Amino acid sequence: PNHGGILVNLKRMNRILAIDPRNWNALIEPGVTYSQLQGELEKHSLRVATPLGSPPSASVLSSYLERNPVVTAADFIFGNELINTYDIVMPTGELFTVGHPPSEKARSMAPDGPALDFYRLFQGAQGTLGIVVRMSIRLLPLPKVQHVLFIPTDTVGQAVAVSQRIQRQELGLECFALNNFDLAAFLVADPAQDKNLRKGKYIGTYGAKRWAEEQVTQFQRLREALPAWTVIICLAGWARRPEEKVEYQKLDLRDLA
């Protein structure tokens, strides 16, 4: 820290304390990563909402506490209200539970309560007000049917207009726009990383390695070939009539076009 302080490495606090498949929530410690949590959630046909571009090695708790917006959201508020409750150790050593759960069995409840609302006080503080040691988060079901559509546009204004028309009708849970630089970066092949993923391994703590020369060349070609902006929308069907849901959303998109 620039002005003094203590850095605490919490990666060994990596237990998934509870998963509630019925109410779509989980209780985790700060060292739990996206890849670790998703590996367990798949056994229950659930998934964790992930910010765009976050590495699998990132801490779920830290990411949510810093309010990194996720793309699996119909609006910004939904994507930043994924925390139910959390326990924070104050500088005095006291344990403070945020979200006012009346008992241990109520951790998955909404954070509103009759007392003062400290729910957002510690969010975005980067640990300067205390250390969060447990957090209850909301989950999403794994889609049974999924279609990803790409809509090319020439300007950011057109991309925004298209996104607004789609989101007014709440079509798809993921809807966002990328310019050709960012989209090309996501599409560049990484043979070493692909090999690790097939083995069940993920990006290490310190992120991906420097690109090879052929990857740089591929990135430049992709960027030149891609449209200036691309709107990406994911249509997904969950437990009930997934094919039917995806089909009527595709028809609604055609009507918008």
Model-derived regions: residue spans:
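Beta-sheet entry/capping signal
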Residues: 5, 148, 230-232
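C-terminal substrate-recognition/cap domain of FAD-linked oxidoreductases
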Residues: 160-257
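Glycine-rich, flexible loop segments associated with nucleotide phosphate handling
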Residues: 2-4, 100, 112-117, 222-227
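Glycine-rich N-terminal segment of FAD-binding domains in flavoprotein oxidoreductases
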Residues: 1-13
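FAD-binding subdomain of flavoenzyme oxidoreductases
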Residues: 15-19, 27-168
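Short secondary-structure transition/capping segments
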Residues: 2, 60-64, 187
